[in-house]
Regions:
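Conserved P-loop NTPase "ATPase switch" module shared by AAA+ and STAND
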Residues: 70-100
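Short acidic, S/G/P-rich loop/turn micro-motifs used as interaction or catalytic elements
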Residues: 26-28, 53-55, 91-98, 125-127
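Conserved catalytic/switch belt of AAA+ P-loop NTPases
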Residues: 92-115
Length: 170
């Protein structure tokens, strides 16, 4: 995973504006991006999905639920010096909408001039060839041995706690 994280961080540092990450592991992806944000001193990681809207920005939480165009326009308006990564989940459902395609084209050039990145996440690759040259597509690899070992240790530890803690009757 270290090599993947380094490559991802290089994409962020080089101001790659649009990155599509193919994965079914949304929470794991968020954690990996969060760790990269800490390393790169990016203080604002914002996520969006069509049910919950924006998460991670004070006074913005819940905005743009079921409005993918609204959230794309939101990142377009973020001009502050505070670097922002916007993680948009399940975007494949909206990708073929002409207004979404147009906005992604605009964001491709606009985000290069800011310290912001748009990360699109889905287990399905984009279907339109129209935007192929504008979006960098990468796959989140399966967990490596060290990640799996850490997960097994965590499960074992929690299981031990569960079975060794005193029962409420004691």
């Amino acid at each position: 995973m270290d090599s993947w994280s380094k490559n991802f961080e290089l994409l962020i540092k080089s101001r790659t504006p649009l990155i599509w990450i193919r994965t079914k592991e949304e929470e794991r992806l968020y954690k990996v991006i969060y760790q990269s944000c800490k390393k790169l001193n990016i203080r604002r990681l914002v996520s969006w999905d069509c049910v919950n809207g924006i998460k991670g920005v004070l006074n913005e939480n819940g905005k743009f639920s079921n409005n993918p165009l609204g959230v794309l326009n939101w990142i377009k308006e973020q001009r502050s010096e505070l670097p922002t990564i916007l993680l948009v989940r399940d975007f494949h459902k909206f990708y073929d909408d002409p207004s979404i395609s147009r906005t992604l084209k605009e964001l491709s050039s606009l985000l290069r001039e800011t310290k912001n990145n748009l990360i699109l996440s889905s287990h399905i690759l984009p279907s339109s060839e129209e935007l192929d040259d504008l979006i960098t597509i990468i796959n989140l690899p399966l967990p490596d041995v060290s990640e799996l070992t850490a997960l097994i240790k965590k499960i074992a530890f929690n299981t031990c706690l569960l079975y060794t803690s005193p029962s409420p009757r004691d």
